[in-house]
Swiss-Prot record:
Disulfide bonds: none
Family per record: To E.coli YebE.
UniProt xrefs under InterPro entries: TerB-like, YebE
Name of protein: Uncharacterized protein in ampR 5'region
Superkingdom, taxonomy of origin: Bacteria
């Protein structure tokens, strides 16, 4: 079938609309990346590459730009969270993206954890796990 569509460059790419969860994850990724006041070109390239690899490059690029244009608002991310798993997923992703080396990043994570209503001890555990995983990668 693919051979019959060789002259159609869009064939095989995802064309279904991106669901709300993916939109929220992209926004969380971008918000975390810009939590220190700006988003680095390298980080934006990594995000866009991941969108392409997921087969959502065109829609993904729009989502990334929309998230960049949004004010950094943890309440916006937390607004439509339906369950504990979604809240933990957003917080984990945000912690994985951020290397806390600036007070603005720490403040953002604290505000996000509060907006998601994640208890402090759970947040501390997630952050510790992420630090250990990052450390094991660099060793």
């Amino acid at each position: 079938i693919r051979q019959n569509h060789q002259d159609e460059p869009q064939y095989g790419q995802q064309v279904a609309p991106i669901d709300q969860r993916v939109q929220r994850l992209v926004m969380a990724l971008v918000f975390a990346a810009k939590s220190d006041g700006h988003i680095e070109r390298k980080m934006r390239s990594i995000i866009e590459q991941n969108m392409r690899e997921a087969g959502i490059s065109e829609q993904g690029e729009r989502l990334v730009q929309q998230a960049i244009d949004q004010p950094l608002d943890p309440q916006l991310l937390a607004r439509d969270i339906q369950n504990e798993e979604e809240a933990l997923e957003l917080y984990f992703l945000s912690c994985a993206v951020i290397d806390v080396d600036h007070f603005m990043e720490r403040t953002y994570l604290a505000a996000l954890g509060h907006a998601l209503k994640i208890p402090q001890d759970v947040r501390d555990g997630i952050e510790q796990d992420i630090r250990e995983k990052k450390q094991s990668i660099t060793d």
